[in-house]
Amino acid sequence: RSSDLGRDGYRSTMFAIIAVFILLLVDFREIIWAFIGMIPLLFGAVWMVGIMEISGLKLNMMNIMAIPLIIGIGIDDGVHILHRYKIERNTGLVYRSTGKAVLLTTLTTMLGFGSLWFATYRGLGSMGISLFIGVGTCFLSTLFIVPMVFGIKEKLFASPGEK
């Protein structure tokens, strides 16, 4: 039943979001870094839904199943960038070093999922496109939104002599 599917999709998505946030808290040991780590997912999800709406892609059973996968995969780029930023404290250096690796791993993941578009079963193709878009938008969010957040964080939480 579609109502069961929607409810299960919602539950699995909420579980994935909460689990990822807890893991970020354990990893970074600071709530501010855990929230920053969630930013690529938030913006990536909004952009993904927007792209799907504009392009006429409808949510279906396979797309709903893709959402927890996007959460699990979409968080990776941001985590790598955050860890490097905590070491370097220089956004340009972070993106020149770790950014290259993150770009290549994201592109290979997107191509792997995008290849599902050619599947005979249309549901699998739809899932592949959703994953392609979702992973891509999470990456773009990591690339464009996270550096702005770094700047804001540094200004808000810098010691008085650093402001």
Where in the sequence are the language-model features?
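Membrane-embedded transmembrane helical bundles of large multi-pass transporters/channels
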Residues: R1-K163
